């Protein structure tokens, strides 16, 4: 952070549905380029390791394990990168499947944040496969690392104490009471929202207005 500013970037890589290896390679290429440009926070889309439109393939252990293998590979490849990266993947925890954001930096998993609000209308049917996240924090083992799991996690940077990161996923922001509201009340100064929202008439403008309004009310980036 310089003069109160943090260089952040949002990415939308070209993905292949259910091809976790390819998707991880695309993410790494963009992440390495971002790190070279001084980006300290890199946000990738919801389900970027698998693609959003996997449907009932999300329930297959092959895809779930493929996403974990891709995440483990990314961790190994980013050990020297001084950039916090957020990537989306499905994660099975105690027999329940969650839509998650993994927070990683320098080869370490800093935490896993599950999605709170699952859309189940129109073209969305996430409740068919996934379980809503809880504010209760628990410890899980992911890619051989003990990591905290829960919707209420905040991440404070030791080198930049004023950088406190809160995380939510897509529909969370569209809800009546977004998790980001509670993150800001708890001290978050930056909110990252991993999204895989589709495009319909007027939606892009509405989404920008939604983000701008929430950022203004919460006094955070």
Q: Whereabouts are the PLM-identified features?
A:
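Enzyme catalytic cores with a strong preference for nitrogen-chemistry domains
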Residues: 1-221
């Amino acid at each position: 952070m310089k003069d109160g500013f943090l260089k952040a970037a949002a990415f939308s890589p070209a993905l292949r549905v259910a091809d976790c290896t390819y998707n991880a390679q695309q993410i790494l290429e963009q992440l390495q380029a971002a790190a070279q440009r001084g980006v300290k926070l890199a946000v990738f889309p919801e389900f970027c390791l698998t693609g959003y439109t996997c449907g009932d393939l999300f329930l297959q252990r092959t895809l779930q394990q493929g996403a974990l293998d891709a995440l483990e590979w990314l961790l190994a490849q980013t050990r020297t990168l001084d950039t916090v990266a957020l990537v989306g993947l499905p994660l099975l925890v105690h027999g329940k499947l969650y839509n998650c954001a993994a927070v990683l930096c320098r080869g370490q998993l800093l935490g896993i944040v599950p999605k709170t609000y699952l859309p189940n209308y129109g073209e969305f049917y996430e409740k068919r496969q996934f379980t809503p996240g809880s504010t209760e924090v628990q410890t899980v083992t992911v890619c051989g690392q003990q990591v905290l799991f829960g919707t209420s996690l905040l991440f404070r940077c030791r080198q930049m104490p004023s950088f406190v990161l809160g995380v939510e996923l897509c529909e969370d922001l569209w809800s009546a009471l977004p998790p980001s509201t509670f993150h800001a009340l708890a001290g978050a100064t930056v909110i990252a929202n991993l999204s895989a929202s589709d495009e319909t008439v007027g939606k892009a403008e509405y989404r920008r207005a939604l983000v701008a309004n929430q950022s203004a009310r919460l006094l955070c980036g």
